Amino acid sequence: NTTATNTLSGGSRAQRGTTRAAHIVGVTVKDTTSYFGWGKASGADFTIDPGLWVIDSFGQTVIALIYNGRAFEWDASLTAATSTRATAITGTEVPTASRHMLVSTPDRHIVFLGTETTLQTVASQDPMFIRWSTQESLTEYTPTAINTAGTQRLTDGSRIMSAIRGRDAMYIWTDTALYLMRYVGLPFTFAFEQVGTNCGLIGKNAAIEVDGAAYWMSENGFFRYTGKLESMQCLVEDYVYDDINTRPRDLIFCGLNNLFGEIMWFFPTSSSEAINRMVSYNYLDSTTQ
């Protein structure tokens, strides 16, 4: 009311998360003592994963996946491409929740990792499940007798961390192991081989491939794969692992300076939630710095 009469009219109220106490609009409210408190604040901790994107090319079409979300496409061949927004890839068979995405070349299959076991059902997302499209398709993911779409579930680990393309296979890391995914054609399309255990990836951007060899940072050391798994000698390993913060693990990333033959890992120390330290490895003379 605009005049102080100690009465309220035409009001309703409710508090989210508490027992509802509402007053119908149009009825005079004289006594509002029927209320409930907000309750005690929760002291539980929780972690929100960073909103990371994966971007790959499918010819002149750019495919982008938001971490644990859906994929988008952007056509670079359009006349007004720079003023055209990316759009979600639509269709009744397109996955809507995935941890990672990669385009297999030269066979041109789109591979979703840590994705849904039941298409377009977010609740069915399995962090160890892999699904790929039929050849040359953005929208067909249901395996049939006449296409090359398919699925595979990895077994060693609790979640797929990341994947990168290599010279003759794709490298797929879980939190505990390394797998190779190779295109073999019909009838299986892809073959999977586990080539390492106790060598999982520490963060989704902590691996790189250089001259046919994969290098990565794990929870328990630095590794290389050149056809066989190798634990890399590192004189500063204790310096790194005694003071690393693994809570924001997906912020840890790997970079390459091929001018000087260096692979670099950037990571946060135990006193920081952001990147503030770097360790480098010279793959030309096999030294760490």
Residue map of PLM features:
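A short beta-strand motif characteristic of beta-propeller blades
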Residues: 36-43, 84-92, 147-154, 191-196
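Structural signature of eukaryotic scaffold interfaces centered on beta-propeller domains
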Residues: 35-59, 93-107, 153-166, 203-210, ...
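Small/polar beta-strand repeat architecture
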Residues: 1-51, 78-83, 93
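Surface-exposed loop/turn elements that mediate protein-protein interactions on large endomembrane-trafficking
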Residues: 72-88, 121-151, 180-191, 223-237, ...
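N-terminal beta-propeller domains
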Residues: 32-39, 95-179, 266-283
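Beta-sheet-dominated scaffold domains
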Residues: 155-289
